[in-house]
Amino acid sequence: MTIKLIVGLGNPGKDYQSNRHNAGFWLCEALAHLYAGNFKKETKFFGEVAQINISGRKVRLLKPTVFMNCSGQSIQSIVNFYQINTNEILIVHDELDIDPGIAKIKFDGGHGGHNGLRDTIQTLGTKAFHRLRIGIGHPGDKSQVTNFVLHAPSKGELEKIQNSLNNSLQIIEDMINGNFDKAIKTLHTKE
């Protein structure tokens, strides 16, 4: 099994581009830059799509242009069109329960309160997809979460998040080729 679709979760528009909640977009944009892909608006997919080639494999990148809590609509449309199995999807998202500077790979599981994952699980009807969780840290109190994710990280936090994104870029090729154990071992030992 290989990864055919990488989805970066985030909110569309310039007002949100530097927010912690857009960490998924940041990784997809870095991948497009690294592998010479160009995002194009695809209204039928409710998103921006780029196609890249990694290790001789065609991989699509998707940044939904709907808000986070409607991400499933965008993902479902591209999955149906290209007949992609859910276990061939990697969803990249911000993770409150992981400190900045750390990224973790996970397969299956719940949404952990993440509205983008919640909608995706509900729309796809399954939790059986890969996740790349980019740590952004937690504000400390549940009542502060919305404000926290919808603001930019501090300079120090951003440096740590960028470091975890760079570490994540180094294991993408392994994930594309189905070497999940190697990718996990490599990424999880960079903490």
From Swiss-Prot:
Catalysis: reaction(s): an N-acyl-L-alpha-aminoacyl-tRNA + H2O = an N-acyl-L-amino acid + a tRNA + H(+)
EC number annotated for this UniProt entry: 3.1.1.29
One Gene Ontology term of the molecular function aspect: tRNA binding
Compartments where located: Cytoplasm
Principal location: cytoplasm
Site (Discriminates between blocked and unblocked aminoacyl-tRNA) location in chain: N11
SUPFAM superfamilies to which the protein is assigned, alphabetical: Peptidyl-tRNA hydrolase-like
Superkingdom of the organism of origin: Bacteria
EC primary class: hydrolase
CDD domains, alphabetized: PTH
Protein residues bound to tRNA: Y16, F67, N69, N115
Any one cellular-component term (Gene Ontology): cytoplasm
Active site, UniProt feature: H21
GO BP annotation list: protein quality control for misfolded or incompletely synthesized proteins; rescue of stalled ribosome
Ligase found in the keyword field: no
Site (Stabilizes the basic form of H active site to accept a proton): D94
Subunit structure: Monomer.
PANTHER family given in the database record: PEPTIDYL-TRNA HYDROLASE (PTHR17224:SF1)
Family listed: Belongs to the PTH family.
HAMAP family tied to this protein: Pept_tRNA_hydro_bact
NCBIfam families membership: pth
Role of this protein: Hydrolyzes ribosome-free peptidyl-tRNAs (with 1 or more amino acids incorporated), which drop off the ribosome during protein synthesis, or as a result of ribosome stalling. Catalyzes the release of premature peptidyl moieties from peptidyl-tRNA molecules trapped in stalled 50S ribosomal subunits, and thus maintains levels of free tRNAs and 50S ribosomes.
Name of this protein: Peptidyl-tRNA hydrolase
Organism: Ruthia magnifica subsp. Calyptogena magnifica
Phylogenetic classification of the source organism: Bacteria, Pseudomonadati, Pseudomonadota, Gammaproteobacteria, Candidatus Pseudothioglobaceae
